[in-house]
């Protein structure tokens, strides 16, 4: 069984003390407050996702995180403890590969959001650069986000959790999940023995390999963090031309086939 890594909340309360009914980094520890200035929290239609700030006006996340009434929070660490750098934005524009519905578990699960207003760089807000080279199998990768720390029940932290996993050969994921095509524009990452993984509610967040932003959390096994069931991540490097084209104003830019 597979799980797209975003789950519904039963009720959205005030952000300062909300407890979200979604899942997050399994097997991780609290992120250092200074290591994720690019990490954003996305709320929409009673759901939660992550995302990555790539410049002062643009956020990259997963296409399946699209919804109405979207709110994007930047500069956040603790949900309960406000800080002077926290900012709220809403989308001005959203861009997809072909359409908002034309994605699969292995292709085009990517969304580029233009914020309604730019954000200023601060101690807790700063963009993450797009990758300068393709990812390498065997790389150590960092995942991060807010949500449950248990694969079987909702146990939600107030602060984002971080964990290190490995970039695996795509064939490992093909062996784990029936129906994956021979080639795709996704990355396979996890720990073969299990215990560490992204999970529901992490969707759209970053996969950072050897210091470079290489992937977007997309989907994986259910329950999360099981042996020989890694996660699937949209390959950012494969979509660079599309991302750069959209940001430059070419709204006709197309994703790779």
Swiss-Prot record:
Expressed by the venom gland. SUPFAM superfamilies: Trypsin-like serine proteases (SSF50494). Its EC number is 3.4.21.-. The keyword Glycoprotein applies. Disulfide bonds join 31-162, 49-65, 97-255, 141-209, 173-188, 199-224. InterPro entries: Peptidase_S1_PA, Peptidase_S1_PA_chymotrypsin, Peptidase_S1A, Trypsin_dom, TRYPSIN_HIS, TRYPSIN_SER. One of its GO terms (cellular component) is secretory granule. Pfam families: Trypsin. It comes from the Eukaryota. Heat-stable to about 95 degrees Celsius. Keywords: Disulfide bond, Fibrinogenolytic toxin, Glycoprotein, Hemostasis impairing toxin, Hydrolase, Hypotensive agent, Protease, Secreted, Serine protease, Signal, Toxin, Zymogen. It is an enzyme of class 3 (hydrolase). Glycans are attached at residue 102. Snake venom serine protease with strong beta-fibrinogenolytic activities, angiotensin I (AGT)-degrading activities and strong kallikrein-like activities in vitro, releasing bradykinin from kininogen (KNG1). Intravenous injection mildly lowers blood pressure in experimental rats, which may be explained by the action on angiotensin I and kininogen. Exhibits amidase activity against N-benzoyl-Pro-Phe-Arg-p-nitroanilide in vitro. Belongs to the peptidase S1 family. Snake venom subfamily. This is Beta-fibrinogenase mucrofibrase-5. It comes from Protobothrops mucrosquamatus.
């Amino acid at each position: 069984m597979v799980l797209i890594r975003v789950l519904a909340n039963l009720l959205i309360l005030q952000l300062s003390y909300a407890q979200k009914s979604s899942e997050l980094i399994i097997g991780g520890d609290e992120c250092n407050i200074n290591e994720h200035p690019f990490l954003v929290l996305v709320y929409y239609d009673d759901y939660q996702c992550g995302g990555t700030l790539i410049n002062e006006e643009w956020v990259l996340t997963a296409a399946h995180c699209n919804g109405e009434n979207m709110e994007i929070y930047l500069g956040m660490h603790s949900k309960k403890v406000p800080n002077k750098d926290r900012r709220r934005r809403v989308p001005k524009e959203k861009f997809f590969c072909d359409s908002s519905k034309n994605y699969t578990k292995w292709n085009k699960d990517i969304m580029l959001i233009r914020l309604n207003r730019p954000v200023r760089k601060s101690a807790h807000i700063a963009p993450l650069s797009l990758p300068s080279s393709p990812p390498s199998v065997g790389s150590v990768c960092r995942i991060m986000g807010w949500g449950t720390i248990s694969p079987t029940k909702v146990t939600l932290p107030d602060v984002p959790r971080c964990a290190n996993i490995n970039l695996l050969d795509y064939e490992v994921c093909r062996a784990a999940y029936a129906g994956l095509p021979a080639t795709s524009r996704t990355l396979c990452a996890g720990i073969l023995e299990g215990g560490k993984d992204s999970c529901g509610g992490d969707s759209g967040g970053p996969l950072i390999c050897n210091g470079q932003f290489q992937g977007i959390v997309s989907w994986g096994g259910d329950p999360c963090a099981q042996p020989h069931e890694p996660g699937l991540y949209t390959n950012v490097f494969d979509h660079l031309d599309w991302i750069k084209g959209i940001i430059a104003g070419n709204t006709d830019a197309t994703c790779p086939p």
